[in-house]
Amino acid sequence: MKRASGVLLHISSLWGSYSCGSFGEAARQFVDFLEKGGFSYWQTLPFCLPDEWASPYSSYSTFSLNPDFIDLEELYKEGLISEKELHGTLHKTPYSVEYDRLKEERMALLAKAAERFSGGKEYEDFFVLHGHTEDFCHFMAGKAVNGQKPFWEWTEQEEDFSVYRTWRFVCYTFFRQWKKIKDYANGKGISIIGDIPMYVSLDSADVWKNPEDFQLDERFRPTRVAGVPPDCFSKDGQLWGNPLYDWKEMEKDGFSIMKLRPPTEVHGFSL
């Protein structure tokens, strides 16, 4: 096996002007830096939409995508956002990710871009190939109309179409922009090492769509949860709270959902 080296740098840590690192020019500059330094790998953290504590290891879906990584300058060049809207997103604290501001403003801007986006055959073909992202989009639309409550408390079944449309646009745009960065890196001899969460959140599209694949009771509460025993990092151990998989149930359909989860499948990573 050939010895090689790489750098772990999540997309959010790339330099940029819009509150968070993105798939913009800084991503290509980082690839150039890796090539110049003789590196062979770029490793990232999961691309999942992070939870309220900004952790990509706890998300609304294994197949979700972080909208903050979308390059806004590319959307401007495509005529999907205005110059005024672009400049309105310039960061106010340049050396950190502006999480609170992103929560308040980014999806609203992407919703405008989604409304202006005309779609097309390539757009629809994407969802034929990546149908698993549709469940996530429907889930987010359901949460929106139910006041962001966990899915087992939903009373409204009618989805918010504008939210569904926005998340479809986010997924398509994310993949399209990421593919350009990945292809650029591969062309420079840089392979991408990906990552995904080991478990999923209880309130997630994964559990909502496939509750039988998890160890839950009739009220959708986990009967067993994930964690780790005491170790040198935590004398009391850790209780993560994620529902455990029901492997016997998954075996009935050949573990189909798990076969979609590897980052090489979800996001097209090299490893």
Where in the sequence are the language-model features?
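Short alpha-helical segments and helix-capping/turn motifs at coil-helix boundaries
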Residues: 25-32, 125, 176-184, 258-261
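Short, solvent-exposed turn/loop segments enriched in Gly/Ser/Thr/Pro and often Arg
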Residues: 43-53, 196-202
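Catalytic domains of carbohydrate-active enzymes, especially glycoside hydrolases
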Residues: 25-50, 264-269
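Mature N-terminal, pre-catalytic/accessory segment of carbohydrate-active enzymes
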Residues: 1-38
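Hydrophobic faces of well-ordered beta-strands that scaffold small-molecule active sites
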Residues: 5-9, 42-43, 192-194, 271
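Alpha-amylase-like alpha-glycosidases and glucanotransferases acting on alpha-linked glucans and related
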Residues: 8-10, 16-19, 54-175, 200-271
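Conserved, well-ordered alpha-helix/loop/beta-strand core segments that scaffold catalytic motifs
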Residues: 167, 171-201
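Conserved, mostly hydrophobic/aromatic
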Residues: 34, 44, 139, 185, ...
